[in-house]
């Protein structure tokens, strides 16, 4: 079995043009303060209020790559962290979007996190505390998040009861 590492072009995740965003309060300064210490962010708001646009705007403003994942009930932990794939040369590891973000120092935006299953969201826990690590159990690797990595999650207020699963 051969295992090859992925080479990632960080520029593909950077937002080239400024996304339109109209500030409605202190959210820009609050986000920047949280980013300065790489504090994970949780953004709550109704559908269509601009949560995703806000995160895109902040990634652009900070000049950081952004990897967005639209969460859903069929998403597995492997969809987030990665999996082994077979090809003509054997087996290779393919990083998932969360792993890629942690490796390259991107902002990882998990949109509608409460749509994901509890057994999927549990993988984010060590990235949200002082450890800032991501265990890749299938690969036997523990990734220390890049110093620029930040996790941002969002949800709609109607799904608040589901937050019990990610607390």
Question: Where do the protein language model's features map onto the residues?
Answer:
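AAA+ P-loop NTPase catalytic core and its hallmark functional loops
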Residues: 1-167
């Amino acid at each position: 079995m051969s295992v090859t590492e992925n080479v990632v072009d960080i520029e593909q995740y950077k937002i080239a043009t400024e996304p339109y965003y109209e500030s409605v309060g202190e959210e820009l300064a609050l986000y920047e303060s949280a980013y300065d210490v790489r504090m994970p962010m949780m953004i709550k708001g109704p559908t269509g209020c601009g949560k995703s646009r806000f995160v895109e705007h902040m990634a652009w403003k900070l000049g950081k790559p952004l990897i967005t994942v639209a969460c859903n009930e069929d998403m597995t932990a492997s969809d987030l962290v990665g999996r082994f794939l077979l090809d003509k040369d054997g087996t290779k590891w393919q990083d998932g979007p969360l792993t890629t973000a942690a490796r390259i120092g991107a902002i990882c935006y998990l949109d509608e996190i409460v749509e994901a299953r509890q057994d999927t969201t549990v993988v984010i826990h060590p990235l949200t505390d002082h450890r800032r690590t991501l265990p890749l159990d299938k690969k036997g690797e523990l990734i220390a998040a890049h110093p620029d990595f930040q996790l941002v999650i969002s949800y709609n207020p109607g799904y608040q009861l589901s937050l019990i699963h990610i607390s």
